[in-house]
A protein has these predicted regions:
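Conserved SAM/SAH cofactor-binding pocket of Class I
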Residues: 1-56, 183-267
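Conserved Class I SAM-dependent methyltransferase catalytic core
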Residues: 89, 101-124, 128-131, 207, ...
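Short amphipathic alpha-helix with an adjacent loop that forms part of the alpha/beta core around
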Residues: 62-69, 256-260
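A short helix->loop->beta-strand "cap" motif at the edges of active sites that frequently abuts
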Residues: 97-100, 220-221, 297
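Conserved proline-anchored active-site loop of SAM-dependent methyltransferases
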Residues: 73-83, 203-211, 262-276
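SAM-dependent Rossmann-like transferase core, predominantly class I methyltransferases
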Residues: 133-199
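N-terminal auxiliary segments of SAM/dcSAM-dependent transferases
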Residues: 84-162
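General small-molecule cofactor/ligand-binding pocket signal
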Residues: 60-62, 129, 170, 224, ...
Length: 336
């Protein structure tokens, strides 16, 4: 059980008074029965899957939830970025009745103390209710009806020109490479193959810039883009539309929802999850790749130089070459 869940559980009596309690951004796998929620919302596909069997229709992987009855309380678990927290609060606030309590819980190392100040946008009486397990629990009462949530107002459009290819890229707070092209992705784009064909998968697509660039260089490919972050999928869809290309964009935890075999993979895979690091997803993705890729299909992967993916790629594919590198990043190439 995660620390934030432990703090919520030790304050379970506090939440027993609510008839319609909303949970936003629950931890993965942790049992939420003690909160008796009316609805649980997540922007993380893996979290959604971890609770789906237990919560069934109570949980939604969505940014379009419209409740039939306003909620009288909400619990928000602190996300990684403050921008994502702002979006989450703006998303749920219109679902709450005036006077409803908003709770924010998170770890101190995740910045809960400074993040709690975001609650002041919804009420002037925010207070710290608990401090334990290296976490804090804050509460505020909604003082006035919140304005309707407008997703488009959170999307920033960035013009990117790379190797004489112009693209418009959509970005939302909380999505990797928000507001600028990161150096790792740029290094992979600089060394992108120009003779790709068939189904090409962009794993951990983020805002969609890598996939869009790959499609621009290889217009005949059938591009597919996957991520577990709903905000990333929304950005990728917008990026594709603005770039005038076509792609199939859908949530998938690694290979789980990718049907059949693909003819190539391009990826700047994630290794952060929440406020920590998590390497297992990418390691498992590489290990499983041989079973999901067609014969002779290329894998092009960029990663920080300190990440030990080369040995896993070599063990899986029999060979791993370094296509390009800087002091911070390395592009690996392998063939099925």
């Amino acid at each position: 059980m995660q620390l934030s869940t432990q703090v919520l559980e030790r304050n379970a009596q506090q939440f027993s008074e609510y008839k319609n309690l909303l949970i936003m951004n629950p931890p993965e796998n942790d049992d939420l029965d003690f909160l008796t929620p009316e609805k649980v919302l997540t922007l993380d596909y893996r979290v959604y899957l971890s609770h789906k069997n237990e919560l069934e229709e109570l949980i939604e992987f969505s940014l379009s939830h419209a409740p039939s009855t306003l909620y009288d309380g909400a619990v928000v678990v602190l996300p990684k970025s403050k921008g994502e927290l702002d979006l989450m609060l703006a998303y749920i606030a219109p679902m709450l009745e005036v006077g409803a309590d908003i709770y924010l819980v998170g770890e101190k190392k995740g910045g809960i103390a400074s993040a709690s100040k975001r609650l002041e946008n919804y009420g002037s009486n925010s207070s710290k209710l608990d401090s334990a397990k290296h976490c804090q629990l804050w509460q505020v009462s909604l003082e006035e009806k919140a304005k309707a949530f407008d997703l488009d107002s959170w999307i920033k459009i960035i013009d990117i020109s790379f190797n004489n290819i112009d693209m418009k890229v959509a970005a939302i707070p909380g999505v990797f490479s928000f507001a600028e092209l990161d150096q790792g992705t740029a290094l992979l784009m600089e060394n992108m193959f120009t003779k790709l064909e068939g189904r090409i998968l962009d794993f951990g697509c983020g805002c969609g810039v890598l996939g869009a660039y790959t499609k621009k260089l290889n217009p005949e490919i059938q591009l597919e883009m996957v991520d577990i972050n709903l905000l990333a999928l929304i950005c990728a869809q917008k990026t594709v539309e603005l770039s005038g290309i076509e792609a199939k964009i859908y949530p998938s935890d690694g290979w789980d929802d990718v049907q059949g075999r693909v003819n190539g993979v391009v990826t700047n895979p994630p290794f952060h999850r929440g406020i920590g690091t998590e390497y297992q997803t990418t390691e498992y993705f590489i290990q499983k790749a041989k079973d999901k890729m067609a014969r002779y299909a290329p894998l092009l992967l960029v990663a920080n130089t300190f990440l030990k993916y080369a040995a896993i790629i070599e063990k899986t594919f029999g060979r791993c070459d370094v296509l390009a590198e800087t002091t911070k990043f390395r592009v690996y190439k392998a063939f099925r």
